[in-house]
Amino acid sequence: MLDIQLIRHNLAQTKQKLALRSKGLETLLDHIFELDFKKRSLQSEIEKYRALRNKQSKEIGLKKIKGENVEGQFSELKKMGSRIEEMEKELIQFENQINTLLLSLPNIPHDSVPTGGPEANKVVKTWGEPRQANFPLKTHWELGRELGILDLERGAKLSGSGFSLFTGNGAKLQRALIQFMLTIHTEEHGYKELWPPYLVTEDCMRGTGHLPKFALDMYATDKDNLYLIPTGEVPLTNFHRDEILAESSLPLRYVAYTPCFRREAGSAGKDTRGLLRLHQFDKVELVQITKPENSYTALEEMVSHAENILRSLNLCYRVVLLASQDMGFGAAKCYDLEVWSPGIQSWLEVSSVSNMENFQSRRMNLRYKSSSGKNILCHTLNGSGTALPRLVAAILENYQKEDGRVLIPEKIRTYFKEEYL
């Protein structure tokens, strides 16, 4: 959530910066500005009435001591109290309106972010070479079916389209990759592992910016008003919601494996074949909570942590700096990591690493106490380290052999215990 001070004191500049993300926000910003002006005017009026009431209350007290008649003044005092109550209710309405509108605004892009849509995305790094083969390469769904490790038909029978079902060595590969990634992130990168709930409250979803903006993309339980998490970012970032952290404890680094659940309401026209776009998928998520001055160093660090996973698996990948209109709702700056999948001849996003600055912490009331005793909003960052379905797809397509077998990447054989699928 944006700071109301930006709109109150720098409206023109805020309009200019948010226009880089989306057109049509000027009217909304003007409306927030007007509501805030009315709210502050009402606050001033309430304060004047309170001061007058206090003054008259003291006068009545002195007159009563002297035995003077205060019936008329007491009646006026009661009317004034009723008027203050009415104005306070009106003030709450203004505050609720403003907060609701602020929740609908995206984050302001960092100055280093390219301007524009997906066409303005910038490839900042490429590692490895796309695989070349002297035989026709199969797609991951063909390999999965032929090896008997991926049953999309039965997944659909159980839950409908958009759900996968791994069997035998396919399930074993998933488990090996999860264990491998968690080991790397905890032992080499210094993250603390959490095993969080997969159902969270509305406050948690609002805290990370998934509500109210993406309500239609979420799976919700109506009776309990709980939401299935769309990403491990939600429980990990909300872990310290409504807390004041010690400055010495920062940065905090958390990692967790979780399944993720997304309705993908806006996926029409996108490639949904095989493992490319699912309603339920597995992911290892990274979150850091930092001081503001350290968050952009942490962002580059988190990108390198996700890269380490891909390099360890010897997968060709590229790092893409997303443009202002292609970033996630709450991101100030975001990198995507994409692996080359030769069977489908496409780059697949397996990680998205974002600096949210204080966009989430303002929503979550997440602060730290500085050495001067001041409570300061933390910066939060999140990233996939990495997502499983497309990583599995890339491994199957990159490591396939002409005889139909798939070589297991060397780094995960310790967990898989076999050389081939």
From Swiss-Prot:
Question: Which Gene Ontology molecular function entries are recorded, alphabetically?
Answer: ATP binding; serine-tRNA ligase activity
Which pathway does the protein contribute to?
Answer: Aminoacyl-tRNA biosynthesis; selenocysteinyl-tRNA(Sec) biosynthesis; L-seryl-tRNA(Sec) from L-serine and tRNA(Sec): step 1/1
Per the database entry, which stretches of residues form a coiled coil?
A: none
Entry binding sites for ATP = 262-264, 349-352
Q: Does the keyword Magnesium apply?
A: no
Keyword line: Aminoacyl-tRNA synthetase, ATP-binding, Cytoplasm, Ligase, Nucleotide-binding, Protein biosynthesis
Give compartment(s): Cytoplasm
Superkingdom assignment: Bacteria
EC class: ligase
Of which family is this protein a member? Belongs to the class-II aminoacyl-tRNA synthetase family. Type-1 seryl-tRNA synthetase subfamily.
Q: What is the stated purpose of this protein?
A: Catalyzes the attachment of serine to tRNA(Ser). Is also able to aminoacylate tRNA(Sec) with serine, to form the misacylated tRNA L-seryl-tRNA(Sec), which will be further converted into selenocysteinyl-tRNA(Sec).
Name of protein: Serine--tRNA ligase
Organism field: Methylacidiphilum infernorum (isolate V4)
Task: Kindly list the organism's lineage.
Answer: Bacteria, Pseudomonadati, Verrucomicrobiota, Methylacidiphilae, Methylacidiphilales
